[in-house]
Amino acid sequence: MAGSFAQLAKNAEKKKPSISVSKEPVENPPLKVYQLGDEALRTPANRIVKVDDAIRKLAKDMLITMYSSKGIGLAAPQVGIQKRLLVIDLNFEDPNSPPMVFINPEIISSSATVDTYEEGCLSIPGVYLNVLRPSSIKLSYRDEMGRPKKMNADGLMARCIQHEIDHLNGVCFVDKVTDEEELKKQLNENNFKRSDVIKATN
C-alpha cells in the first residue's frame, strides 16, 4: 500500500501546474504594458529555441501583469519582449482555474465559419470594437515545459488565441476593424492616433 500511495503522490505532483501564480492584482506589476503607437507592438516576435527557467519566469511575470490589468490574454511583444510567447486565462476571477502558456503557437487550420465579436486590448485601453475572425481553429504549440501540444479551440478561446498570435506578428486588433467611423471615434476619445493603425490584409 505504501508503494501505491507513493505512486499516487507522484502522479498528483505531475498534474500540478508548472507555473503557479496568484491571480490577485499587484500594485506594481513586474512588466510594463506598451500601448498602441510604440514600435514594440509592430515588431514580429522571434521563435523561442529553448524552453527554460528564464522563459517560465517571463511567463509568470506576464501572468502577474495580466491579472493586475484584469486581462484574459497577453503576448510577449506587449511587454516589449520579442519572443513568441503568450499567456491566456479566460477565468481570471477563478483562483482554481489554471492559466495556459503557449510557446511558439501556430494556427494549423481555421474554420470557414466566421463570426464578429467585440474585442479589447490591454495595449489599447478604452477601445472596444467588433472584429471578424474564424469561429474555430486548430493550434500547435509548446507548453511551459517545452512539451509539444495540439488543441482545437472555438468560441472565446479561439478568438483570444488569434488576437494574441496577431501580436506576435506585429498586428493589433484595431488593424482588422472595418467600421472606420467608430474606429476613429474611439481612438480619438482615448488619445490614440489613427495613423498608428495599419490596415491588415487578412
From Swiss-Prot:
Pfam family of the protein (one) = Pep_deformylase
Query: Region Disordered: which residues?
Result: 1-24
| Cofactor annotation | Fe(2+)
Q: What reaction does this catalyse?
A: N-terminal N-formyl-L-methionyl-[peptide] + H2O = N-terminal L-methionyl-[peptide] + formate
- One GO process term, biological-process aspect: co-translational protein modification
Binding positions for Fe cation per the UniProt entry: 121, 163, 167
- The UniProt record lists the EC number as 3.5.1.88
> Record's Gene3D superfamilies?
Peptide deformylase
**Record-annotated active site:** 164
SUPFAM superfamilies (alphabetical):
Peptide deformylase
Q: In terms of domain of life, where is this protein from?
A: Bacteria
Q: How is the cofactor bound?
A: Binds 1 Fe(2+) ion.
Under the GO molecular function aspect, what terms does this record hold? metal ion binding; peptide deformylase activity
What are the UniProt keywords, alphabetically? Hydrolase, Iron, Metal-binding, Protein biosynthesis
Family (UniProt)? Belongs to the polypeptide deformylase family.
What does the protein in this record do?
Removes the formyl group from the N-terminal Met of newly synthesized proteins. Requires at least a dipeptide for an efficient rate of reaction. N-terminal L-methionine is a prerequisite for activity but the enzyme has broad specificity at other positions.
HAMAP family xref list: Pep_deformylase (MF_00163)
Name of this protein: Peptide deformylase
What organism is this sequence from?
Answer: Prochlorococcus marinus (strain NATL1A)
The gene from which this protein is expressed is def
